[in-house]
């Protein structure tokens, strides 16, 4: 990899409400992609570094490739209005590993209006879960309608919460206007290949820029 590309790894923002599966998604992506790509992660929590520790304990990556940021306030602010702490963490990772391909940036749990600053993220993934109800896609918001890739997680819970996957599929197609998305069950790996293929495609685009 050229020195120029080494200084500009692809940055992937991962947002979504609390408990939707953002950390679980990053864990699976890291485990499946780390043999082909040089990866690192920045996690955001308000008062702790819980998500960082979860990923370390799960051996998603080596511990020094995962940095936890304590935002100390609204998680939306740290990924949109004032991204300085996240940019410092990214800079630290790039200085430490000069051949990084992809950095995943996990936002703190937030609502459907949360979006990443273009300064912080090249591509945005957004995670919602079936347990929140089948009405979530039609509620809209930037995470649903504008994210580069939408993940509807925990499809195995649909039968237990009375959610219709057919309704969610119809509403998602309507709200996203042909933007890519997928159903997932991160416990079994169902749907994850669609996410990985999307990232591989975008990485090829970034390499040409």
Swiss-Prot record:
Compartments in which it is found: Cytoplasm
Residues that coordinate or bind GTP: 16-23
One GO cellular component, as annotated: cytoplasm
GO molecular function list: GTP binding; GTPase activity; nickel cation binding
Keywords noted in UniProt: Chaperone, Cytoplasm, GTP-binding, Nickel insertion, Nucleotide-binding
GO biological process, one term: urea catabolic process
InterPro entries recorded: CobW/HypB/UreG_nucleotide-bd, P-loop_NTPase, UreG
Domain of life per record: Bacteria
Gene3D superfamilies (alphabetical): P-loop containing nucleotide triphosphate hydrolases
Assembly description: Homodimer. UreD, UreF and UreG form a complex that acts as a GTP-hydrolysis-dependent molecular chaperone, activating the urease apoprotein by helping to assemble the nickel containing metallocenter of UreC. The UreE protein probably delivers the nickel.
Recorded family membership: Belongs to the SIMIBI class G3E GTPase family. UreG subfamily.
Protein task: Facilitates the functional incorporation of the urease nickel metallocenter. This process requires GTP hydrolysis, probably effectuated by UreG.
NCBIfam families, A to Z: ureG
Protein name per the record: Urease accessory protein UreG
Protein encoded by which gene: ureG
